[in-house]
């Protein structure tokens, strides 16, 4: 069994996916919401999986005062918040493990908590990492695009990892929701997979042909030619460069990282500070799930999910295109325009991305609305939102409906983790032999 710790666990998406993949044992988990007294995500996590080896404490406090409570493990997983990756945070973290300086951002310290665990474990640090984040991580911050991701990659290579990443839209691979996220896999020096990659004559073969991510999520280079699946440095679309300098220098670098440059494409790998990266398109020819596939029977839908005729005008306005004059609260006139969004949502395609504001009766531009019969409309239920993320029904049943929607807006698509988990497990044991 591959032993796992799950950080920033939420309601347990990584755990559900790895349980479905089989061959993994979650030996410790942490979920802490610093901004509220109530801890609904952690409560749901323990309701599903039990409270043994689960921590509902500030991870910084755990690392500072209870580091030995974090067991040794083979795989660290987590969907860390995408906020501020300032190296000053790292210095602050190393000195106090707390944010007391007021440096911009409130959750950037959470990346450095992963780093602190890897450093603290030393020779016993995990062989593998599986991380998830919003895809715009590759382009943060807007004034120095790619800087934050470079800091993450550089800090991991300093700890002896080969790192690959891939932007995966779940719907591109048959799943029922269009949810685009960057997934990061890292392999430590000495691990079976690291040894294999390190011995490859051409490291790009790992991300183009037979790697942990390419096998379950095959992609081809995006060069406008549907017939061209060959990848090499002869193709101008594949880029190679070095990440140079200390973490502090990377943070201040405004030459490499500019408002217009985009150094990191949606597929890539880094070894010893050398990056190979390219933009790619999905290559999937299997079955596709749609929004219509996850709907409950109408007789099971509570009445409050149906849209009343009196609210329909507001829904239509918010969903529609706008090209109008508006006035601010201070009396300043301005022009406002935006395009229409699909209304109602198509049932024969994967859904739009679930957002945290999905719950509640109030009309909204972004909530999903379906037409269940001519002229009869409703919102999606918590169970349907769970199904769009490929959780089991009622995974979040301990929370109120609006909070359940919020939690699903923060969750990942379990099917992605399941496929990555199966691939990692297979490759680990194959190369171990």
Question: Model regions: which residues?
Answer:
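Conserved S-adenosyl-L-methionine
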Residues: 56-57, 135, 161-172
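Short glycine-biased active-site loop of nucleotidyltransferases that positions the nucleotide triphosphate
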Residues: 67-69, 174-177
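Core alpha/beta nucleotide-donor-binding catalytic domains of modification enzymes
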Residues: 2-125, 134-147
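C-terminal target-recognition/interaction regions appended to catalytic cores
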Residues: 254-433
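Conserved Class I S-adenosyl-L-methionine
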Residues: 144-164
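Residues that flank catalytic or metal-binding motifs in active/ligand-binding sites
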Residues: 152, 164, 178-182, 350
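A structural motif corresponding to the C-terminal end of an alpha-helix
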Residues: 113-128, 155-160, 391
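Flexible, glycine-/basic-rich loop-and-beta segments that form/coincide
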Residues: 175-262
């Amino acid at each position: 069994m591959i032993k796992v710790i799950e950080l920033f666990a939420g309601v347990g998406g990584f755990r559900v996916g790895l349980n479905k993949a089989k061959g993994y044992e979650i030996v410790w988990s942490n979920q802490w919401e610093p901004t509220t007294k109530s801890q609904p995500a952690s409560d749901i996590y323990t309701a599903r999986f039990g409270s043994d080896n689960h921590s509902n404490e500030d991870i910084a406090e755990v690392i500072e005062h209870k580091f030995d409570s974090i067991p040794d493990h083979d795989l660290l997983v987590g969907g860390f918040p995408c906020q501020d990756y300032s190296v000053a945070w790292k210095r602050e973290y190393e000195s106090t493990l707390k944010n007391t300086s007021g440096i911009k951002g409130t959750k950037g310290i959470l990346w450095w908590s992963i780093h602190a665990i890897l450093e603290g474990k030393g020779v016993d640090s995990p062989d593998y990492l599986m991380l998830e984040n919003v895809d715009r991580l590759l382009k943060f911050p807007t004034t120095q695009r790619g800087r934050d991701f470079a800091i993450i990659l550089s800090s991991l290579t300093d700890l002896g990892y080969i790192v690959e990443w891939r932007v995966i839209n779940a719907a591109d691979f048959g799943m029922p929701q269009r949810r685009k996220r960057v997934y990061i896999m890292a392999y430590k020096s000495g691990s079976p997979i690291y040894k294999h990659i390190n011995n490859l004559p051409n490291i790009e073969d790992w991300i183009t042909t037979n790697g942990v991510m390419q096998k379950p999520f095959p992609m081809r280079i995006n060069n406008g030619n549907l017939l061209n699946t060959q990848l090499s440095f002869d193709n101008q679309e594949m880029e190679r460069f070095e990440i140079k300098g200390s973490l502090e220098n990377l943070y201040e670098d405004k030459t490499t990282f500019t408002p217009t440059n985009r150094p990191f494409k949606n597929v890539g790998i880094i070894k010893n500070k050398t990056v190979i990266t390219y933009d790619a398109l999905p290559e999937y020819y299997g079955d596709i799930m749609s929004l219509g596939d996850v709907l409950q029977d109408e007789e099971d839908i509570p009445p409050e999910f149906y849209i009343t005729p009196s609210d329909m005008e507001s829904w239509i306005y918010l969903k529609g295109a706008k090209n109008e004059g508006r006035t601010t609260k201070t009396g300043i006139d301005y022009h406002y325009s935006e395009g229409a969004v699909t209304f109602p949502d198509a049932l024969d395609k994967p859904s739009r991305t679930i957002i945290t504001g999905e719950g509640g009766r109030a009309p909204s531009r972004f909530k999903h609305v379906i037409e269940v019969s001519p002229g009869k409309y409703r919102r999606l239920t918590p169970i349907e939102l769970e199904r769009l993320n490929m959780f089991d029904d009622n995974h979040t049943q301990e929370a109120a409906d609006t909070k359940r929607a919020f939690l699903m807006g923060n969750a990942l698509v379990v099917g992605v983790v399941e496929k990555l988990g199966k691939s990692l497990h297979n490759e680990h044991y194959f190369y171990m032999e």
